[in-house]
Amino acid sequence: MTADDSQQAVIDFLSDPANFDGVPVKRIDTHAATVFLVGDRAHKIKRAVRFSFLDFSTLAKRKAACEAEIAVNRAYAPAIYRGVVAITREQNGRLAIGGRGEPVEWSVEMRRFDEVQTLDRLAEAGEIDESLAEALGRAVAAAHRLAPSVANGHTTETLSEIIAQNEADLTAEPELFSLDHVRALGAATRDALERVKPLLQARERAGLVRRCHGDLHLGNIVLIEGKPVVFDAIEFDDRIATGDVYYDLAFLLMDLIQRGLHTAANIVLNRYLTETRRVHDLDVLAALPLFMSIRAAIRAKVIAARHRQKGSQPELVNSARDYAALAQKFLAPAEPKLVAIGGLSGTGKSVLARTLAPALLPLPGAVVLRSDVERKALFGIDETEKLPDRAYSVETTIRVYRGLTEKARRITAAGYSAIVDAVFASSVERSEIAKSANSAAFYGLFL
């Protein structure tokens, strides 16, 4: 019996309700796994496949991958991941789950969740609203706080390898992607990486290269009890999952943008920045278009692999091409803008800022800076808490506007747009914010 035959027997076994006391079985196939949903449980086996980016071709490799999946994902979703279970062949020749016979396959056992609550399904239903986008930004920031730093992560070398592998994989699909497009994308991506290498190396030294999720698209996030829970992190290659935290975030931003959810993507980015409160994160915005482009190219080649497995399916062809086109779009030059919105409290500055932000380039839109949030950050309190009276002293106000000006300068220097929401009562405040625009176009609005 070949490996394929052996695994097909396991698939047939796990697909049969008769082996689960008649409980219906729902089967879900991906390019690298097959999941069987039964009652309140899910059994996930690795497919006996080998791609340029993963190898599950032997039973030993699939067992190791299952064990790694549990180890990695329990940090994100301990309530979902239960353990690794053997599929065994018993003395009577029958298969069993967790039996005493020889293991012929390995399964990740999980607690089943409502699959219509995954965020890709919610996106299709138009249910990713501003509140959920805010929660997403918080959830990713929380996950990254827990992610272990990796010394000598060689992030730029890894990115160079990923770019080269993306180009090779897309080139191998001439029916889907034109050679000219693939070559142009590869060249533009390499050039973009060269421009930000010193920045990324500095961030690695600062501990911002971490063992992250690695596959943070909407299909790998689910709502449980109303809160977004991240699952299905990459387990098969620590190198792929290790990188700058913004490279991890970029997958989610890219996926939202590809689905036309620009407002949600902008809210996620702004919430993430607010939660992390790292001023030097504003500098890494210079690398965000590159990160999103690489993620889009990865998605294109993964969908191409699925197309190859399933045969010609127009929706997969179109999807793969859309992601490849988006990868190129992210690298197109964009003219950043700095918009200062002034006026007294209650005049609608914040509403206007949130409305304008997703429409400004580069994607996913402008970073919104608010004087009230900046003031509360100085006092180390949450943006929903009330400030003490001393927070409104002249000295504090000077510090607030200096902080806003410095952040606006960093954002525009990184090639991104910024919107500053503040009173701007004095001419000095208005003059200084205009100077921070660098080469970006400046617009001042007073409500």
Annotate each predicted stretch with a short phrase.
Residues 349:
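Conserved lysine of the Walker
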Residues 439-447:
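Conserved phosphate-donor/acceptor-positioning beta-strand/loop module used by diverse small-molecule
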Residues 352, 356:
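Hydrophobic positions on the alpha1 helix immediately C-terminal to the Walker A/P-loop
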Residues 7-213, 218-298:
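Conserved ATP-binding subdomain of kinase catalytic cores across diverse folds
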Residues 236-243, 256-259, 382-401, 422-428:
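Short, contiguous acidic/charged loop-to-helix segments that flank catalytic cores in large enzymes
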Residues 357-416:
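Conserved substrate/cofactor phosphate-moiety recognition/catalytic segment
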Residues 301-344:
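ATP/Mg2+ or Mg2+-diphosphate-binding catalytic cores
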Residues 208, 334-339, 415-416:
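Pre-Walker A (Motif I) flank of P-loop NTPase domains
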